[in-house]
Curated annotation (Swiss-Prot):
One Pfam family per UniProt: ILVD_EDD_N
NCBIfam families reported for this sequence: ilvD (TIGR00110), PRK12448.1 (NF009103)
Ligand binding ([2Fe-2S] cluster): C122, C195
GO biological process: isoleucine biosynthetic process; L-valine biosynthetic process
Keyword Metal-binding carried by entry: yes
Species of provenance: Shewanella denitrificans (strain OS217 / ATCC BAA-1090 / DSM 15013)
Domain of life of the native organism: Bacteria
Stated family: Belongs to the IlvD/Edd family.
Enzyme class: lyase
GO MF annotation list: 2 iron, 2 sulfur cluster binding; dihydroxy-acid dehydratase activity; magnesium ion binding
UniProt-recorded name of the protein: Dihydroxy-acid dehydratase
Residues engaged in binding Mg(2+): D81, D123, K124, E494
Active site residues according to the UniProt entry: S520
Role according to the record: Functions in the biosynthesis of branched-chain amino acids. Catalyzes the dehydration of (2R,3R)-2,3-dihydroxy-3-methylpentanoate (2,3-dihydroxy-3-methylvalerate) into 2-oxo-3-methylpentanoate (2-oxo-3-methylvalerate) and of (2R)-2,3-dihydroxy-3-methylbutanoate (2,3-dihydroxyisovalerate) into 2-oxo-3-methylbutanoate (2-oxoisovalerate), the penultimate precursor to L-isoleucine and L-valine, respectively.
Encoding gene (name): ilvD
Length: 619
């Protein structure tokens, strides 16, 4: 039977000083010997997805105390990608993932915590905490802040649903009046919570359900709904149950590395592709797999992407559905249920929502709308929006008149009635990206699944934005933005502004964009990111010249620079001959802080999840 980790600092005469300090935090004599559960919160007033999390730790703590544990809460940083976007702040977004992972590890290991509850929500916070949890391998439950309600406004006598991307596109579109642009801006983000579409934050919170590390509804229940309160309480109860299973019953299935196994990563990827999740999820799944010491690679993602259909279509891929609609249709568990019926899911895997001796199949039996006979579950998934602007969690209790269990025409479809038999994400490869790149096919117009165009090359996102807004980019161009990868940026910026501006200029379906950077979960259109290797690491994207023909074929999973191998090799030799000036952007003026330089020094390309290069650390 494993000994409590916390005993290191709470038992024996030699720990009198540590116990004295524990007492100063409020612990009493009878608290020593109880499991100490760390609560990693990410409350901040900077981020709408986190502005309501201040009191969530107390909810979790109350359930832990009731179950016989001691909780100790700490906070991590949280960067808002939407606010950091379009300026130098975006350089810090992806590197913050590593800082969050490290800070959770530091706090948990320094204080010998026995288990962990991760209160996350937005883009890099959930992945950072996930990496830490798998690195630490102690009992863990994730519970997120939940998605915000979709914005709604009245334009031309019609009520339309909105999100952050709509505000950006409208503001850049000269045909939209100042009055309408202001209406959209004020309505796009009405409540606390992660942005309302299937962007990176919501995608990752859904994936924690599929990995088996969070409770049903975690990815879809609205931040504002009173039903979400129970998720925080249940997270506290569940982490205590897992803690007892591991430390008392010696049950290693309670540990995250045994829950988030290779099969679980396959499940998460299948979910991601079925729901057309953010392309950033690929980056984070690859990074998490490395922390879990699971040999899960881009090749596995490619393999799964070729057989999983697109079962759930959500903004930004359609204006019709947002996360509130996904929840009404049964959330992640109902998408997993459809994958199971299509024989595309492993159900013999552990899950934090499963009791001892159970697995995912038992969780689906309770929570998949097609299977369940439980009226309480159907009521749970009827939780809906109130349409009242607020920054308060649990501020409303509105319900849809019925759940959406229409698997032919609803938000979630069966395989037979899928939005498309091709999934929502695809891995492409070719001489531009020999180690792969990612496209969110859910957001690509059918007419653009194959595209041939001229290269319009930019050495930075800023230059690309200027070129798009200045009229340099025309229909038929393939916009190439390079030296924006993890090492070259550094920080692998998101390219939401270039794609939004292409849309606002009417070029969204007439141009393609490829980059060694990445895209916001809010991106749609023929946007291909994560080109690997990146330009700064000797990737062929650095060898593309103005006017080169680029051929993109999504059905064939290829992306090809239409020049001969000999010409490409000659360009490579010419670049190498530049010495220290080679594989660097031309004439780019960008301040890079010491912190970012340290990140760049160890960063790998996107095909490795943009994690640290361990070969440089292991000697």
């Amino acid at each position: 039977m494993p000994k409590l980790r916390s005993a290191t600092s709470t038992e024996g005469r030699n720990m009198a000083g540590a116990r004295a300090l524990w007492r100063a935090t409020g612990m009493k004599d009878n608290d020593f010997g109880k499991p100490i559960i760390a609560i990693a919160n990410s409350y901040t007033q900077f981020v709408p997805g986190h502005v309501h999390l201040k009191d969530m730790g107390d909810l979790v703590a109350s359930a832990i105390a009731e179950a016989g544990g001691i909780s100790k809460e700490f906070n991590t940083i949280a960067v808002d990608d939407g606010i950091a976007m379009g300026h130098g702040g975006m350089l810090y977004s992806l590197p913050s993932r590593e800082l969050i992972a490290d800070s959770v590890e530091y706090m948990v290991n320094a204080h010998c915590a026995d288990a962990l509850v991760c209160i996350s929500n937005c883009d890099k916070i959930t992945p950072g905490m996930l990496m830490a949890a798998l690195r630490l391998n102690i009992p863990v439950v994730f519970v997120s802040g939940g998605p915000m309600e979709a914005g709604k406004t009245k334009l031309s006598d019609k009520i339309i649903k909105l999100d952050l991307v709509d505000a950006m596109v409208a503001a850049a579109d000269s045909s939209v009046s100042e009055e309408d642009s202001a209406k959209i801006e004020r309505s796009a983000c009405p409540t606390c919570g992660s942005c309302s579409g299937m962007f990176t934050a919501n995608s990752m919170n859904c994936l924690t359900e599929a990995l088996g590390l969070s409770l049903p509804g975690n990815g879809s229940m609205l931040a504002t709904h009173s039903d979400r309160r129970e998720l925080f309480l249940e997270a506290g109860r569940r982490v205590m149950a897992l803690t007892k299973r591991y430390y008392h019953d010696d049950d290693e299935t309670a540990l995250p590395r045994n829950i988030a196994s290779f099969k679980a990563f396959e499940n998460a990827t299948a979910l991601d592709i079925a729901m057309g999740g953010s392309s950033n999820t690929v980056l984070h799944l690859l990074a998490a797999a490395q922390e879990a010491e699971v040999d899960f690679t881009m090749a596995d993602i490619d393999r799964i992407s070729r057989k999983v259909p697109h079962l759930c279509k959500v903004a930004p891929s359609t204006p019709k559905y947002h996360m509130e609609d996904v929840h009404r249709a049964g959330g992640v568990m109902s998408i997993l249920g459809e994958l199971d019926r299509a024989d595309l899911l492993h159900t013999d895997v552990p899950h934090v929502a499963a009791d001892s001796g159970e697995n995912l199949s038992h969780v689906l039996a309770r929570y998949d709308l097609v299977q369940t006979q439980d009226e309480n579950v159907r009521r749970f998934f009827s939780a809906g929006p109130a349409g009242i602007p607020t920054t308060k969690a649990f501020s409303q209790s509105c319900r849809w008149p019925s759940v959406d269990d229409d698997r032919q025409n609803g938000c979630i479809r069966s395989r037979e009635f899928a939005f498309s038999q091709e999934g929502g994400l695809a891995v492409l490869s070719g001489n531009i990206a020999p180690k792969g790149c990612i496209v969110k096919t859910a957001g690509v117009d059918e007419d653009n699944l194959t595209f041939v165009g001229r290269a319009r090359v930019y050495e930075s996102q800023d230059d690309a934005v200027a070129g798009i807004l200045g009229g340099e980019v025309v229909a038929g161009d393939v916009v190439v933005i390079r030296y924006e990868g993890p090492k070259g940026g550094p920080g692998m910026q998101e390219m939401l502004y270039p794609t939004s501006y292409l849309k606002s200029r009417g070029l969204g379906a007439q141009c393609a964009l490829i980059t060694d950077g990445r895209f916001s979960g809010g991106t749609s259109g023929l946007s291909i990111g994560h080109v690997s290797p990146e330009a700064a690491s000797g990737g062929a994207i650095a060898l593309i010249e103005q006017g080169d023909e680029i051929v993109i074929d999504i059905p064939a999973r290829t992306i090809v620079l239409n020049v001969s191998d000999s010409e490409l090799e000659a360009r490579r030799q010419a670049m190498d001959a530049k010495g220290v000036l080679g594989w660097k952007p031309l004439n780019r003026q960008r301040y890079v802080s010491l912190a970012l330089k340290a990140y760049a020094l160890l960063a790998t390309s996107a095909d490795m999840g943009a994690v640290r290069d361990r070969t440089l650390l292991e000697g």
